[in-house]
Amino acid sequence: VIAVRFGASKTGKQNLVISYAPNPVSEGKMTVNGNNELLWNALLDNNNMQYAVRIKAINKGGSISNDGGRLIVKNADEVLILLTADTDYKENFDPDFNDPKTYVGEDPVANTDKWIKQASTKGYNQLLDEHYADYTQLFSRVSLQLNDASATKNDRPINQRLADYR
């Protein structure tokens, strides 16, 4: 889930048009769920892989309406935009090439619906906290310090540092 929050220092200043420009090498259909959610469900031209892109806007203040596959946000104080995407591709290390569904997995429409519903209940701050926790767990596993003694050299003027280097 990608979460983007738009806000302003003054109330009622968020006026947005949200739409999705589909992949040009696919055939699909845009559907609307309520007045604040878009779903693009499509098949790629070259391999018929199904994919889905779902966009939901959650407003504080103002209004959201749907206009032919576009979400129109008017006079909102804040807008949270959630985006989910998925394909039906399934890794298969022992494929049966006679089976046309050998690489077809889960339904991307159902997956994106489940993910966006879960994210919608959390709010931006909780999503951000979960992102930090996930990110920190992955990227704080390693630390690297090069030449701790160099910290004292940072106080020296550049010309002295260059002289030491030569």
Q: Where are the model-predicted features located?
A:
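Aromatic-residue-lined binding/catalytic grooves and analogous aromatic/hydrophobic interfacial grooves
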Residues: 1-166
